[in-house]
Amino acid sequence: QKKDKKDRFPNGLV
């Protein structure tokens, strides 16, 4: 799930 990363880091820290 690529959305998992955006969901956890909506700020784009990762």
Swiss-Prot record:
Record-listed Pyrrolidone carboxylic acid modification sites: Q1
Report which superkingdom the organism of origin falls in: Eukaryota
> Where does this polypeptide localize?
Secreted
Q: Which key words are in the record?
A: Amidation, Pyrrolidone carboxylic acid, Secreted
Q: What tissues harbor this protein?
A: Expressed by the venom gland.
Residues that the record marks as modified (Valine amide) are V14
Chain coiled-coil ranges = none
Does the record's keyword annotation contain Secreted? yes
Query: Which GO cellular component terms, listed alphabetically, does the Swiss-Prot or TrEMBL entry include?
Result: extracellular region
Family membership, please give it: Belongs to the tachykinin family.
Q: What is this protein called?
A: Tachykinin-like peptide-XV
Organism of provenance? Phoneutria nigriventer (Brazilian armed spider)
